[in-house]
């Protein structure tokens, strides 16, 4: 309530600032699913300001994926080499930053489109021109703190969340492989090399496997960094509880309550990955792509959409769908446009696809029916598709 009272004078400006910040963060870091740790906190503020869940979701997951679509520094594990790569390097472009201007164009236009879309929805709701079937169950998001904590301070929460965000950004951006910046690697080597009379301080007290900032995606494992993110969140949670003198029992109860809320999300994640396993092992998408014989923007885009829907995880999407599509390309002049196309398709499917992990989390956690979300978001998705097609066409013509 204290935080809400401070941002309430901003009104809709807070929504617009949230959209811009999430989009910029995703664009500059390439993070998408990793940012869900901040969604409940920000969305709760939006709900307490009096806006509905659709505004909260589109201002968070919508802006994150808009940022990904216009992501300037997006990288992922290449299943062929097990190293980090950009979309440009993946398709074969020698300059990994060749699409900086087109992506910035996508980013700015996408943010403007989302702000317009959300603002129009808010206006229509206020004027009672639209109505969506949404359960009024904000108690699922904001629970009364157990115990006598009336004098609890908000500044530790803000400071610690800011610290988590900074570490997350520094840890996830591949400084060495993407920018050839070795400062964090050398700092890590210096810290791990510290010793007292032959006793290695850092490796023996903390860990021998904790990687340097910017190298959290190590060993070609696309999920390895989630271990460090989980440990970081656990540490932050315990620190906040300690500073605010929250009782151990209350901390455990709140943690258990949070796990209980996430159980449906975990179940749906399991279902989504079951679809992935069946699709990936069957290999029918690769067969369809191979039978296409040649690259075609229309057909290849449809196959990319299908691959993103069925394979769920970006690592397997790249392995089973994007790689075969790129192998069909014989004209090197279209590499840059294809990189933008594939990145954009993955981002769009993540906003609207029923198997999108970030969407599954959001809709389940906030109890929003998928049909309601689809009814609300389809116009924005159509606008994004047209915007992506326009930018890709411009790159092809240039």
Predicted ranges, named:
Residues 25-34, 78, 170-181, 242-252, ...:
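Transmembrane helix-loop junctions in multi-pass membrane proteins
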Residues 85-86, 94-222, 226-250, 365-372, ...:
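Long, contiguous bundles of hydrophobic transmembrane helices that form the permeation core
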């Amino acid at each position: 309530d204290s935080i809400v009272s401070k941002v309430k004078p901003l009104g809709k400006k807070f929504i617009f600032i949230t959209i811009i910040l999430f989009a910029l963060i995703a664009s500059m870091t390439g993070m998408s699913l990793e940012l869900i740790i901040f969604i409940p906190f920000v969305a709760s503020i939006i709900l307490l300001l009096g806006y509905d869940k659709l505004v909260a979701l589109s201002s968070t997951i919508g802006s994150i994926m808009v940022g990904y679509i216009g992501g300037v520094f997006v990288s992922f594990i290449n299943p062929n080499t097990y190293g980090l790569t950009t979309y440009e390097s993946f398709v074969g472009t020698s300059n990994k930053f060749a699409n900086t201007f087109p992506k910035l164009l996508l980013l700015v236009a996408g943010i403007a489109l989302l702000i317009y879309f959300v603002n129009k929805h808010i206006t229509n709701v206020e004027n009672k021109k639209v109505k969506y079937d949404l359960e009024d169950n904000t108690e699922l998001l904001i629970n009364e703190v157990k115990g006598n904590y009336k004098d609890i301070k908000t500044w530790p929460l803000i400071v610690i969340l800011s610290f988590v965000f900074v570490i997350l950004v520094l840890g996830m951006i591949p400084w060495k492989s993407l920018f050839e910046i070795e400062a964090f690697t050398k700092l890590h080597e210096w810290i791990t090399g510290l010793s007292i009379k032959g006793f290695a301080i850092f490796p023996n007290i903390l860990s021998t496997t904790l990687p340097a900032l910017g190298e959290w995606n190590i060993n070609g494992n696309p999920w390895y960094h989630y271990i460090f993110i989980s440990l970081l969140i656990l540490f932050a949670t315990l620190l906040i509880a300690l500073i605010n003198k929250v009782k151990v029992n209350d901390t455990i109860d709140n943690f258990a309550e949070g796990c209980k809320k996430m159980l449906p999300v975990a179940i749906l994640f399991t279902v989504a990955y079951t679809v992935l396993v069946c699709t990936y092992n069957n290999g029918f998408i690769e067969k369809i792509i191979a039978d296409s014989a040649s690259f075609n923007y229309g057909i290849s885009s449809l196959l990319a959409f299908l691959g993103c829907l069925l394979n769920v995880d970006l690592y397997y999407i790249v392995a089973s769908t994007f790689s075969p599509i790129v192998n069909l390309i014989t004209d090197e002049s279209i590499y840059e446009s294809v990189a933008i196309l594939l990145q954009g398709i993955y981002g769009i499917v993540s906003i609207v696809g029923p198997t999108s992990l970030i969407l599954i989390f959001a809709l389940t956690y906030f109890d929003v029916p998928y049909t309601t979300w689809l009814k609300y978001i389809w116009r924005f998705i159509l606008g994004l598709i047209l915007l992506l097609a326009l930018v890709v066409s411009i790159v092809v013509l240039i």
